[in-house]
């Protein structure tokens, strides 16, 4: 069936105040509303202008077709569920302006349908209509507002508005439409077979004979639509007909009323079908009478022309039959013998763990042998409740009990067979066989061996819809959730348990318990072996894993021995019959011998026995709720602590990785800087003819530096103007290749010669001590321990023009004048062995050194200072009493010179560790050394203090500094007054005691250097760094600045640069720089 929402076209006549409301409430428009929907419809169709003035204009009336945009998509279901009905209103011309403002009120009809079951009511048959008009009614697959293109009908105002006493026949004759009627019918539920626009509806279906069965008590939310044959005229109601109108879904509506005869529903039983049919006919008769009376009254009142008609508000409330109270839906579980509250609970009852647990426990109890020595040796079984009683009295009490009576009442209501109340007496030895033979089909013992099938679609429908009461949907016995029990080895008599079907009305519970359903369930299991194979292991697993009842625990834990038999007393009546048992330890009573055995094995009795009788009895520990909560809290805190430490470790690991990454990036950038400047220095035609080699010179030592690449320099950020000036100045002050090779040559020759001198002196000492040849070790007989580089040679701070380098010769004993002279005598001989060149050697006793000069250009000078670590050790032990007992040699060298040589060793080691790896540090120190040599003011600045200051200024920066930024930062530090007196000063990090490296400077020297640094900082701020560095300004590399300069000032013809011209105009004297 295709859901169709009819669009009714009517003529709006505003001559009487409240007439349209009367027509709406009088069921004129073809709607049968219920409840709030009727009130809403009446209020909606009754909106009128404030004054009820009759319009009498003989002009042509404009016809408007107003459509309501759909609020939500219409759901296509098996039943008719129109979501909105649009009304085409034809109004006179003067009312057209007011219609635009109230289009929302007249445009649509809101509905609140919650169900999809709509019955078809009957309406009185109207008078035979005239032949259908020439225009064809089209279906359009659209929801938009479209005006009708057909011309409107011109009505005579006098004929309609000025004849209040006209008869019904005259009115009917005048109301006949013209051939071109502005009627357009819309289909609100589009389907695939429709064509767009104004095409014909070509998908026609064969008229089906359907007789709808109305439920006995429909849902309160159900709204019934009355669908009538479509007619283009409005005529008085004729005699009522008792047929249901029919329509064929073709290009046009058929105006002939044809009776529907519905297709047969084989799923319903005859009794239910007949009852529903009779009830439906009664309801149809009542509704036909009420609808006929209401329609006749409304139609007569609409055309009588009276100004006021007395009406009863909301007449269609009388058409709604009073609903009986809805009985609750019953869901009965054949296994547990209980009724469930709803379909979801019923499904959970069948397939939840409690079902399997009940089944497994019952099987264990039935299969486990019970001691035959008990007084009661027989069991009385109740077939209806599946309950076993230990005696006749207990069975009689069960029969009289509320549980049994409730089950009997439920079975009576369901129409299920009720077995006899005679007990089924079974001996305990054969209880397992007797129980399984006498139980119904759905007993728990047979459930364990049965196959449980579950229809997924039916479960989903039940859980989502909650078994909603729909007229055309029902859950069959095969599709509904059920437990079909098929025992495999059961030879006893089998009583078939009736199954349950839920009929669509929601209140009819049909019982179709027969053997055909059992056979159908069996066939379903056979046809679906996968479902049975899946379900059987799950039932068994739950049954084994979750035995929770005390009976199952007592049956499974057979190794627990009962204790305290003597403390259980038998209580007898006057006749001497045992009526109950009393436990003195637990202060409890019970009347079952089996309960006595279970009580003696129980944990409570054993705990009381351990507490009062035998403390050594072992009882299993079962933590209480409080102890369990405490344990869970401890575990939770422990897990939180572990999580906390795990996160801490991850954070530490992340920080280490970030730190390692930053260090790698820093060293990589520094190496790129070094490679860049080395490549620029080696470029023959580059901008920097002799670029610097990086932080270290050729003679410097830096462990771990990779070899220089032969390819092009890596990409780096563009240099600033200050960087270009600093690097250009550094290239000019850096030593040439000849100077570096000369220094390297004379230093290496001197070191090799001193090694030979040490060997010669050691051989001479061995010849004097003949007895100690085998006793003395090789290291102790040497007077000279080694030679080390210090000063600018070790630090890599050589400048162009430097001819002096320093070496330190370590001695095993305190250096003396005799040792100095012997070294000076042997050194020329060893130099002649190593190099053919001639060297001039001088012995400077006052300096505690040997001075070696080369005779070949470039002439280099090497100062070799003798020292020993013993001198500093003795200086540190000045407070010791034994230090004065050791007498120094009479010809020992100057102690201060030796201490200065040891300090130079420490300074070189510190510089290699701290300053060599710092970006731009070595470059800036070379720049400042050149400044100290050029400017007399800076010549008093100690070199060691300057190195400490530069290292601290650059290392304290937040990021690596470029050469220009580093030079500016050093000048800023000095300008702040850090070297002035009264400040902490610069402490020597190589001394154990606090020592200020600026102690040798006077106050005037400190102030002069500070003032000069401030003046240099001002020059840097005004782009006069070339004056600070003592160099000529560089040509501009960016053409944009040259254009700017040309605009500001015309360049001179002689090519003088703008910076030089500005320098000439400056009145300050920069000779100090």
Curated annotation (Swiss-Prot):
Residues 761-781, 1061-1073 have a biased composition (Basic and acidic residues). GO terms for cellular component: chromosome; cytoplasm; nucleus. It is found in: Nucleus; Cytoplasm; Cytoplasmic granule; Chromosome. It comes from the Eukaryota. Residues 425-443 have a biased composition (Low complexity). There is a cross-link at residues 508, 540, 622 (Glycyl lysine isopeptide (Lys-Gly) (interchain with G-Cter in SUMO2)). Expressed in hippocampus. This is Zinc finger RNA-binding protein. The modification Phosphoserine is found at residue 1053. InterPro entries: DZF_dom, DZF_dom_C, DZF_dom_N, Matrin/U1-like-C_Znf_C2H2, NT_sf, Znf_C2H2_sf, Znf_C2H2_type. It comes from Rattus norvegicus (Rat). Residues 120-139, 419-443, 701-722, 759-781, 1039-1073 are annotated as: Disordered. Involved in postimplantation and gastrulation stages of development. Binds to DNA and RNA. Involved in the nucleocytoplasmic shuttling of STAU2. The modification N6-acetyllysine is found at residues 508, 515. Its main location: nucleus. Keywords: Acetylation, Chromosome, Cytoplasm, Developmental protein, DNA-binding, Isopeptide bond, Nucleus, Phosphoprotein, Repeat, RNA-binding, Ubl conjugation.
